[in-house]
Design a protein with these regions (language model features):
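RNase H-like, metal-dependent nuclease domains and their acidic two-metal-ion catalytic environment used
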Residues: 1-102, 140-222
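Short alpha-helix plus adjacent loop in nuclease-associated cores
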Residues: 101-148
Length: 222
């Protein structure tokens, strides 16, 4: 059985002088054998409502990886859309963690960032649809967690799945192909951090040294 770990971090911009809302979510990608579809199991999810600085959070994430030998080669992806997110990318890079810097857009598709960075521009709705489709296919494992953050993630993913069923059913009845429809909520850090982690996992093999694909995808086939 092959394993790999992927950590997604999302940030909601702070209101006024308050601290930003931050969530990090860790998924384990595994497969039973060659040719078998990968599954993604929630390892942990945590909300941070009182982060003092990007450096403090980077220290915490570095400690999380260092204290868990079995996830020591975890691949990270950070939503850098907010100023705090961009600062966190820099702080993680300073610590040698080499995160993927994601910029979420309202447009569809995915494009690589600048040649000199590990970055990506992603359609937020596409990332969300891929995540929900994996849940619909039974390839997400969100159970066996007692925290409120994990319970909220499971509830909201199920609600999104039911909404997507309705959307796709309406489109089928009209004889049309569904291209969008899910509403991407920039404030739902628990959903975004999880969706980013799983997106990165679906774009990379079980070799943690692998870079992003030259032509990243947004469907749910990986």
């Amino acid at each position: 059985m092959a394993h790999a770990f992927f950590l997604g971090v999302d940030v909601t911009p702070a209101d006024g002088d308050g601290a930003p809302d931050v969530t990090h979510t860790l998924f384990e990608k595994s497969t039973e054998g060659a040719g078998e579809p990968a599954t993604y199991r929630l390892n942990r999810i945590r909300d941070h409502a009182d982060v003092a600085s990007a450096d403090d959070l980077a220290d915490h994430l570095q400690g999380l990886v260092a204290d868990q030998p079995y996830i020591g080669r975890t691949s990270l992806i950070v939503n850098r859309g907010a100023a705090f997110g961009a600062a966190l990318v820099g702080a993680l890079e300073d610590r040698g963690l080499d995160p993927v810097a994601a910029t979420l857009t309202d447009e569809g598709g995915a494009t690589a960032g600048a040649p000199d960075e590990v970055g990506i521009h992603l359609g937020g709705g596409d990332v969300l649809r891929r995540f929900v489709n994996l849940h619909r296919d039974g390839r997400l494992r969100l159970e066996n967690h007692a925290t409120e953050a994990a319970s909220r993630l499971a509830r909201d993913v199920q609600a999104l799945s039911e909404r997507l069923d309705e959307i796709d059913g309406d489109m089928e009845a009209l004889g049309e192909t569904q291209t969008d429809g899910l509403s991407f909520d920039p404030g739902a850090t628990h959903i975004t951090s999880a969706a980013l982690a799983v997106w990165l996992g679906s774009e990379r093999s079980f070799d943690p040294s692998q870079r992003l694909k030259t032509s990243p995808q947004t469907d749910a086939g990986a």
